[in-house]
């Protein structure tokens, strides 16, 4: 079973490499957006661990934690709701406040005989993301109702993507992915757009060995003020109802889509640049499962 499932996913992942050869022809507008951004950080700092390096602006991020997360495979994970292979996690802080993270998942694990049995969602999620990146349909995909379909993520978010905006494909030196503004919810609350807004990037390396998942908190100055997890209410302070809330989300999607990436805080292109600074040199990600034990390195 392991060989069949791995070969199926890798067969599709091979198609992702075609994107590398044709991206400059199909995504010229992405290149133009990147070129409009300064090419250097004000206070660049490069960190390197386990063969993975990235460069960030130490004037923006006051602290970075690098965590070698232990694997949590079935049938006996520490948390049955959070099953995952060993992975390398970069956590970013600004003035002691968490602002985002970049997580690297190995797509093979030599320490597990059956990858699908150990991590049931890893290969299907990778397959769905690889197919999206390869086929590149216009984003966001939509249901007949007009509501956006969820964008595949490597790790189960255990929540619903109920709001999407600024979704587009992005090519990096290390691979290809998709970036999008998103809000997640585990309940039916009518959360205001901006109350839990994140910018997320999901990608796969060109050599098909690592999947990358980045998530950063963002805001926009033109959004109506709202507190964390704030909700939309009518003039009497009551729920506006599902139909009205869906119309509100569609309106806000269009509203944010019209905003330039550089106008967000932090700018979306700065997050893309941070993720794009990743470099892999002699990375043995398939060996992380037998090596990582939770060690944390702090850079300040």
Where are these regions (language model features)?
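A short acidic-to-branched-hydrophobic micro-motif
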Residues: 64-151, 213-218, 222-225
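N-terminal secretory signal peptides that target proteins for export/translocation
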Residues: 1-24
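Sec-dependent signal peptide recognition
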Residues: 25-32
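Boundary at the C-terminal end of the N-terminal hydrophobic targeting segment
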Residues: 40-44
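Surface-exposed amphipathic alpha-helical segments
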Residues: 218-300
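Signature of long, low-cysteine stretches enriched in small and polar/charged residues
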Residues: 80-82, 128-209, 215-224
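N-terminal module-boundary/linker segments of secreted carbohydrate-active enzymes
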Residues: 55-60
């Amino acid at each position: 079973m392991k060989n069949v499932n791995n070969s199926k996913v890798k067969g599709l992942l091979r198609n992702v490499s075609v994107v590398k050869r044709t991206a400059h022809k199909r995504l010229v507008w992405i290149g133009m957006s990147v070129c409009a951004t300064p090419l250097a950080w004000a206070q660049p700092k490069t960190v390197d661990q386990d063969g993975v390096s990235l460069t960030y602006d130490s004037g923006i991020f006051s602290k970075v934690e690098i965590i070698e997360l232990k694997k949590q495979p079935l049938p006996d994970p520490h948390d049955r709701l959070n099953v995952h292979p060993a992975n390398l996690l970069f956590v970013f802080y600004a003035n002691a406040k968490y602002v985002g993270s970049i997580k690297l998942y190995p797509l093979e694990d030599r320490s597990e005989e059956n990858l699908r049995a150990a991590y049931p969602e890893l290969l299907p999620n990778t397959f769905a993301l690889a197919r999206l990146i390869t086929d590149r349909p216009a984003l966001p995909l939509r249901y007949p109702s007009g509501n956006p379909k969820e964008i595949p993520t490597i790790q189960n978010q255990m929540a619903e993507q109920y709001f999407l905006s600024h979704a587009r494909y992005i090519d990096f030196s290390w691979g290809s992915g998709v970036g999008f503004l998103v809000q997640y919810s585990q309940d039916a609350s009518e959360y205001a757009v901006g109350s839990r807004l994140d910018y997320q990037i999901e990608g796969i390396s060109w050599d098909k060995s690592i999947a990358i998942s980045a998530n950063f908190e963002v805001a926009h100055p033109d959004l109506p003020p709202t507190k964390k997890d704030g909700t939309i209410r009518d003039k009497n302070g009551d729920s506006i109802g599902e139909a009205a809330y869906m119309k509100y989300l569609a309106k806000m999607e269009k509203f944010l889509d019209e905003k330039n990436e550089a106008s967000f805080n932090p700018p979306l292109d700065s997050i893309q640049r941070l993720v794009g600074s990743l470099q892999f040199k002699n990375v043995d990600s398939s060996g992380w499962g037998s090596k990582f034990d939770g060690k944390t390195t702090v850079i300040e």
